[in-house]
Every structure is written in structure tokens, then in C-alpha cells.
């Protein structure tokens, strides 16, 4: 059961409020409601709260060296939900503990490409970009001895603050094949084209087939641009599964955990 945001807000402590929005679904004419949460701010607040609650009883938290942020999404019971799993890792790269936080929600009957594009995809992409550009969550002590967490920002230079440690952040994306295909622009899985390398079903079906050239976000964008400006004809063979532009533009494809197609 999900606690209503209004009730969570009422507690008033260490809560990151959602950013709400609406849009009119062109396919149904209905008003779709959605919300997202800024992931960078959520990391600062949630990890700090977790550390304060657990570090006294779990001494391994003192050895934290890195954080993995895994974004995922799924649809069910008339709603789309996007969550992040925060994996806390020690200096050996082993998982110390995990947190799961909801970062996006859409009231919709289907999580189509257009629905995602018109709602949570943009804000979550910008939010992930902020985390990636920062690259680390810093543990900081102020002159009064209080400890807090802050995303690394090279433009911030407060000499009164002491950086205790800097937790390197890696970002990944996961989800079922439908969700992964949608956010990569491979709408409706594009007739079975490989998400990894762009081979057609005829090419990847043989057991001992040759490996194709691995996709990059830049290569996908080039395919769409070439078709849009008329350099390349808009055919299935030329699209190679790239039906539309990717909705996630800051996480490289080799950081996706995709279902195995071949």
C-alpha cells in the first residue's frame, strides 16, 4: 500500500515533495496526472536519514565508498511507477545495504512512448543528468560539527566545510523489455530488432550469427536525424528499430540491464 503524499508531507521531516503535472492524452482526450521527484535531492535526504538511523547499529556504514543508482519503471493496475534502488557499497565494492524510493508516477491505462514523453521522462532524464554530472555524494562536516550529505558541485567552495568522504555514484537503468524499448525509442520493440546492436530478426535468429555493431545513444540519434532531414528513407531496414528519439539521453546503453533477446 502506498501512503498518500499528503500524509507523508504532514510528518514534515526529511521529505522531498513531488513535482506534479498534467497533460491531455491525444489518444484518449483525457487529462493525465503525474508526478516526479528530483533524484539528486532525494539522494541527499534519504541517504543522510538512513545513515543517521543505521550507522550506530551498523558499523560497516562507516566504510561506504560508493553508490549505485538504478532507475526502473513498470505499469500495473492503471498506474505507471518509476523507482530507484540505491545500493550502498563499501571499499571492496560489496553491497552494504539498499534503499528503494519511488521517483515517478502516472495515472494511465498504458505507459506508451507518448505518455512517458509527455510526463515523467523529461524530468527524470534531467534529474539523472544532474546526478551523473555531479558524480558523487559528499559527506560534509560544518563548523558546528554537524554532518550532512550534499551532491558534489565543483562551483561550491566553502572553506568552512570539511569534506569527510566522497561517495562515487554510478547510474544504471533497468525494466522489462517494453519499458526499456520505449525509453530508448524502440517503440513496440520495433518488430524484434535487437536493442543492443540493431540486428534484424532474420540476422540474429541463427544460433551462430555474427555480432552486430553495438548501439550508442549518439548512433541512435544519428539514425533519427538522418531520417528526419530526408537524407535516409524512412524504412524499417533504415530505422533498425530506432522508431523515435530516446527519452533517456544521459545514461549510455551499456549501463542498461536489458532482458536477453539473443
Name each region found by the language model.
Residues 129-262:
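Charged (Asp/Glu and Lys/Arg) segments that form or flank catalytic channels of large polymer-
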Residues 71-72, 124, 169, 194:
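Generic structural hydrophobic/aromatic packing signal, biased to beta-strands
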Residues 5-83, 155:
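Structured nucleic-acid-interacting core domains from mobile-element enzymes and related host factors
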Residues 63-118, 122, 199:
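Acidic, metal-ligating active-site segments
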